[in-house]
From Swiss-Prot:
This is Platelet glycoprotein 4. The record marks 463 as: Critical for TLR4-TLR6 dimerization and signaling. Residues 93-120 are annotated as: Required for interaction with thrombospondins, THBS1 and THBS2. Residues 30-439 are extracellular. Palmitoylated by ZDHHC5. Palmitoylation is required for proper localization at the plasma membrane. Ubiquitinated at Lys-469 and Lys-472. Ubiquitination is induced by fatty acids such as oleic acid and leads to degradation by the proteasome. Ubiquitination and degradation are inhibited by insulin which blocks the effect of fatty acids. Residues 1-7, 462-472 are cytoplasmic. GO terms for biological process: amyloid fibril formation; amyloid-beta clearance by cellular catabolic process; cell adhesion; cellular response to diacyl bacterial lipopeptide; cellular response to low-density lipoprotein particle stimulus; cholesterol import; energy homeostasis; intestinal absorption. PANTHER family: PLATELET GLYCOPROTEIN 4 (PTHR11923:SF12), SCAVENGER RECEPTOR CLASS B TYPE-1 SR-B1 (PTHR11923). One of its GO terms (molecular function) is low-density lipoprotein particle receptor activity. The gene is CD36.
Length: 472
């Protein structure tokens, strides 16, 4: 009987040891299986989970606009006073609802090329007003004229056309006109062929962004979704040195197995440059653990604060010899028009930029850009892209509408918040197919290992105790 009991205890200990060993073996083997599955499913080719969602996003994307309505246009034009603005919005559009087009796989270099059609549908229920709401804003054509045409004689001619068209420094426009374009009366009088339609995002509807050429990940999963070229080029021709490079992905996804220490690099055609995000915090999104990556303040810092930004400083006067920060001059990619990009309300901008403007209230929580990335797959499941469009206007002695100005203004026109969050149905599918299976595998591994160790220790203690008792 003693032998039977001892044998039973030994058998229990052996079973425990086997379970513990199996649990231990399952950890690396399970991780290998997960890694193999993920690598297969994030490749951008027909039949994978990634490809289906890549061709047409399953996430509803909204772009909200807040317009800066100028309250004292005459004071500014006559006395060069501070510009008083009042933010009005949001006015919401649904965007990025069209599938990618002209998708072409290249098996030779493991890339896939495409264009992204543009479209915007107004959402009245998510807006404070209609597309016919009017705003007092900077006259985009008048403000740009002295930047594009620097010759004094040409400016004299332009001044006569500005006066003839009854244009001034400021104008009243509807939301639809401001965003998507209007026939400008001044430009319509110019006696030689130039574009006469003006709008912050003109042209947009029925256009396409690209051609993009990205790596599909078949030969190297660490390159999946990374942009190989944009419009047939690997550089932008806007900036000097490495600032001109097209880096990273389009931010919709990143190579899998994202670590917190990784810097996520991505290219945005909206701001005509590549930029990056760094880890901010762990959060849970609809039951899915994600890493929140944020755009750091140093991305728009001056070269004095961040020497890596020296090649983004393209002129010395407006930037106070490259000491101002928080704005980016993108005029080179806007046909010479004096467009400056910043974070909303000049968040993280130097005081000299915001000093001539009253009515701004920068807020880190409301105005920062972030990406919520699921670390196993590298998919961006939620994002908020926030940026502000500004126009530089400066004194011009030959143009009466601008001759009374005594300072340069970087005038905020509007700011936008483009957001997307994985839907409930997609989130459930993601939990079931990805994170749920990984969690279950991890739980099984820990249960087997823990149960095996406990059984082994318990049965061995009992066996030793039993033998000790029998000897006595």
């Amino acid at each position: 009987m003693g032998c039977d009991r001892n044998c039973g205890l030994i058998a229990g200990a052996v079973i425990g040891a086997v379970l513990a060993v199996f649990g231990g073996i399952l950890m690396p083997v399970g991780d290998m299986l997960v890694e193999k599955t993920i690598k297969k499913e994030v490749v951008l080719e027909e039949g994978t989970i990634a490809f289906k969602n890549w061709v047409k996003t399953g996430t509803t994307v909204y772009r909200q606009f807040w317009i800066f309505d100028v309250q004292n246009p005459d004071e500014v034009a006559v006395n060069s006073s501070k510009i008083k603005v009042k933010q009005r919005g949001p006015y919401t559009y649904r965007v990025r609802y069209l599938a990618k087009e002209n998708i072409t796989q290249d098996p030779v270099d493991s890339t896939v090329s495409f264009v992204q059609p543009n479209g915007a549908i107004f959402e009245p229920s998510l807006s404070v007003g209609t597309e016919n709401d009017t705003f007092t804003i900077l006259n985009l054509a008048v403000a740009a004229a002295p930047h594009i045409y620097t010759n004094s004689f040409v400016q004299v001619v332009l001044n006569s056309l500005i006066k003839k068209s009854k244009s001034s420094m400021f104008q009243t426009r509807t939301l639809r006109e401001l965003l998507w374009g209007y026939k400008d009366p001044f430009l319509s009088l110019v006696p030689y062929p130039i574009p006469t339609t003006v709008g912050v995002f003109y042209p947009y509807n029925d256009t396409a962004d690209g051609v993009y050429k990205v790596f599909n990940g078949k030969d190297d999963i660490n390159k999946v979704a990374i942009i190989d070229s944009y419009k047939g080029k690997r550089n932008l021709s806007y900036w000097e040195s490495y600032c001109d490079m097209i880096n990273g992905t389009d931010a919709a996804s990143f190579p899998p197995f994202v670590e917190k220490s990784r810097v996520l690099r991505f290219f945005s055609s909206d701001i005509c440059r590549s930029i990056y995000a760094v880890f901010g915090s762990d959060i849970e999104l609809k039951g899915i653990p994600v890493y929140r990556f944020i755009l750091p303040a140093k991305a728009f810092a001056s070269p004095v604060q961040n020497p890596d930004n020296h090649c983004f400083c393209t002129e010395k006067v407006i930037s106070n010899n490259c000491t101002s920060y928080g704005v980016l001059d993108i005029s080179k990619c806007k046909q010479g028009r004096p467009v400056y990009i910043s974070l909303p309300h000049f968040l993280h901008a130097s005081p000299d930029i915001s000093e001539p403007i009253e009515g701004l209230n920068p807020n880190e929580e409301e105005h920062r850009t972030y990406l919520d990335v699921e670390p196993i797959t590298g998919f961006t499941l939620q994002f908020a892209k926030r940026l502000q469009v500004n126009i530089l206007v400066k004194p011009a002695r030959k143009i009466e509408a601008l001759k009374n100005l005594k300072r340069n203004y970087i005038v905020p026109i509007l700011w936008l918040n483009e957001t997307g969050t994985i839907g409930d149905e997609k989130a459930e599918m993601f939990r079931n197919q990805v994170t749920g299976k990984v969690k279950l595998l991890g739980l099984v591994e820990m249960v087997l290992l823990g149960l095996g160790v406990v059984m082994f220790v318990a049965f061995m203690i009992s066996y030793c105790a039993c033998r000790s008792k029998n000897r006595k």
